[in-house]
């Protein structure tokens, strides 16, 4: 999740790759016979945008035709696909009993619109509500990737989850070598402030355990890179000690 699907498409085009040829393959091209399809138990649709993929519609509608609506389905989507695909998706997913949607959202408002090309935060929230209303059996979770910009609106993302009764899944962080987008591009004090605001919003709610776990993950990821790239190189005999690591953690993040 180091780049949005639209940016990846732009890079492919710049490199002279035929993007359309990838998305227009059929089930036959992948050797997906009815016998193989009948044995499917789980389906994971990931980015680009699955609801704009012809192979997605072909397989999912084939599963409905074959009566295999018991298949477990997981989507990773940014909820900003065209209206005709949106209506088609609602009609399709009405058939499936076990569906979970991981809605990619790396911030709120103008921040996330800057982060993800073509993202419209207002449309995202509107489409989210329509899905919840039309498909009450579908589980929806916000899939958050920590970035140097988005981390400052993590508290807003958490509030969105609470307001709309959504799950939260924050398992990702931009890799440190992508310096301008990594949380390691900001100061410990700024990161600490953003994370403290986020835990405060989640405190006493159903999201408190998962947010606490995610915050600890981000802090440990931030610290591990500091040590690996800077301090540890200077004196691995000192900075590699667990006792010192704990001390630095407490000093930077008051934990």
List the predicted regions and their residue ranges:
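Alpha-helical repeat scaffolds in large eukaryotic proteins
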Residues: 61-64, 129
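Distinct, well-ordered alpha-helical segments
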Residues: 57-61, 84-92, 153-155
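Conserved C-terminal portion of the radical SAM core fold
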Residues: 74, 94-105, 121-254
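Pre-Walker A adenine-sensing motif
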Residues: 31
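A general structural signal for short secondary-structure junctions and capping/turn motifs
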Residues: 34-35, 133
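Core AdoMet radical
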Residues: 1-26, 37-54, 66-85, 93-125, ...
